[in-house]
Amino acid sequence: MIDRYSLLRPWLFCLDPEQAHNLTLKNLDRAQRFGLLQRLVSKPIADPQNLCGIEFPNPVGLAAGLDKDGKHIDSLAALGFGFLEIGTVTPRPQAGNPKPRMFRLPQAEAIINRMGFNNDGVEACVSRVRQSIFWQRGGVLGLNIGKNAITPIEDAASDYIAAMEAVYEIATYITVNISSPNTQNLRALQGEDMLRSLLRSLDDARKRLSDRYGVRKPLFLKIAPDLDQNDIHLIADLLMEFNIDAVIATNTTISREAVTGMQYGEETGGLSGAPVRIASNIVIRALKARLGVQLPIIGVGGILSGADAREKIMAGASLVQLYSGLIYKGPDLVSECAKALRQS
């Protein structure tokens, strides 16, 4: 598939990035419906991993952001991922930021986006999840939740709780996204006082939902790469204090050091792809040093090869997630990473 994708990529890269994204997913859906995907992609790699009481068929997952609304679950699952994470979804629908809001930087194998949590709202997403064959067959599906842009940061907990309540019954795990740079003031939730308050509220809400549904769903927290050692230690300590089950490291970066002087390099938004790899690994190592074996880490950021995936595991991650690497390397990156991790 990578050879085929290398033929398609120049054509896709002539299109607006968001248009190319949507067109690719629509064609992926068509291929899946007609049974073509199974012929085009490698057979899924079996390498089971058990974390947080969840059996992951292999350690390579899809990061949130590629399928924000759960419209493409079955076709993405056919690419061989061990788990999918969809979203970010918010309690109410929102359009996100004005277009253009996604930019490619091919020289750096990077993407800048300022999407702004554009989504159809959590209820629409839940409905689509229920209709997916992947979910009906028990596939590992994470739901990534956020707050609406119009919700004051002081009231963020109410949005996260509303979204958590909506997805609780259908999610294998729930990821709390407090690290996108594209919603005003969202990263302030990573500060000590606000994070403590938010995690306390989420822990209490999860206890109520566990009683209601008779099952305790794992809660993950997704953090930024733009944190210093003290920030990382503080977050790690709060994760343990408030019973968060895992941490996803990391989201996109606001740093532009690696893309200075490049076309679109100064666009506002989060930078992903190859330039975030080292920063993500630094955060993973710092988290591992603080958390030890008490809380697992999911590594994401700059994985464009099997070697990059192994590097995340060596840094301290237990699982990895892909997004920007798929844009540059194509769907066979999934099996490449899964094979590399099985052999390591």
Swiss-Prot record:
Monomer. GO terms for molecular function: dihydroorotate dehydrogenase (quinone) activity. Pathway: Pyrimidine metabolism; UMP biosynthesis via de novo pathway; orotate from (S)-dihydroorotate (quinone route): step 1/1. Binds 1 FMN per subunit. This is Dihydroorotate dehydrogenase (quinone). It is found in: Cell membrane. It is a peripheral membrane protein. The gene is pyrD. Belongs to the dihydroorotate dehydrogenase family. Type 2 subfamily. It catalyses: (S)-dihydroorotate + a quinone = orotate + a quinol. Its EC number is 1.3.5.2.
